[in-house]
């Protein structure tokens, strides 16, 4: 899994259970990566070192252990509304904590689809039903 993390531009995690961190050393994430831990587990070590952190709602994340130490926080809705630029440089490492609000889930999937649909035949992407409670 470390090799996957090291090479990824976008990493989306939808796990429902995590004991601790998924990746002990946050330095494996290259500049420019965006991590979207939908259920907000396993990436807390990135909270204080990533360049920007977004949440779908401040009230959902304001009690996070490291909330006061986020370098640059805003709500993802501000980006979608055009009031926040979002990524300010191609080197920024970004966390987007998505608590699972359905509207944001649909928007994320829509944007990802737009980015990949002209390069890949989406029907050819293999998906496997998870067999464990924990998966990436």
Show which residues each predicted segment covers.
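Short helix-capping and hinge/turn segments at secondary-structure transitions, especially at repeat
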Residues: 10-20
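Glycine/threonine-rich flexible loop motifs
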Residues: 19-27
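Short acidic low-complexity segments
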Residues: 1-8, 23
């Amino acid at each position: 899994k470390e090799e996957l993390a090291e090479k990824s531009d976008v990493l989306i995690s939808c796990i429902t259970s995590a004991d601790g961190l998924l990746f002990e050393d946050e330095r494996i994430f290259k500049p420019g990566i965006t991590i979207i831990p939908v259920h907000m587990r396993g990436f807390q070590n990135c909270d204080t070192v990533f360049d920007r952190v977004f949440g779908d709602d401040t009230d959902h994340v304001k009690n996070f252990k490291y909330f006061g130490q986020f370098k640059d926080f805003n709500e993802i809705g501000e980006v979608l509304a055009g009031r926040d630029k979002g990524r300010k440089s191609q080197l920024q490492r970004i966390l987007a904590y998505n608590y699972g609000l359905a509207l944001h889930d649909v928007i994320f999937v829509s944007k990802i689809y737009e980015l990949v649909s002209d390069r890949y035949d989406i029907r050819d992407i293999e998906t496997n039903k998870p067999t464990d409670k924990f998966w990436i």
